[in-house]
Amino acid sequence: MNNPLVVCALKDEFGIKGLNYDVLYTGVGKVNAAIQLTEYLLKKGRPEYIVNYGTAGSKKVKVGSLVDCTKFVQRDMDVSGLGFKKYETPFEDGISKKIDFSAFENNPLNHLLTCATGDSFITTIGGHVGDVVDMESYALAKVCLKFDISFIAFKYISDSADEDASIDWVENLKKGQKLFKKTVLEVWNLF
């Protein structure tokens, strides 16, 4: 596990310096994440595996927890009016509505949670699938699936996806960085 690529939306979410591998900052949202990761892979080649780190909201997981996500869905994909299942992208061969990387080796946490990704910062959770919500992971997982690269996401639960979510998110950024460094990077000898 010597050649990872760590992918984050924002420098504010990661901010760990002195690493001997690449960290890619994609910007916020599914489109930015997919474009930036694909561009990186085409220019720099394949890393051994890709680790997404970032913050997430959850009603199911306690704020302040670091969790791993190995299953990913698009929470804002809804073409049910045309007879498709909710969260399923129409006319895609071989990709189910849920992308599953549960077989990722050397996972230090093994919660194997589902991350529901969409292009909105959630301040209320209602009717969404998944254990946690974010804005990039599904897109990153889909690129990894297409390029046949192992993928895992670690999410620091920064907020409860409620009316205080934006305040909680800012206050919890540094706590998440420290926990990710200790729980994942140091365990994998990547720091």
Model regions and ranges:
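Structural motif
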Residues: V7-K11
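Glycine-rich phosphate- or other oxyanion-binding loops that anchor nucleotides, phosphorylated ligands
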Residues: D12-F191
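Extreme N-terminal starter segment of soluble prokaryotic enzymes
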Residues: M1-L5
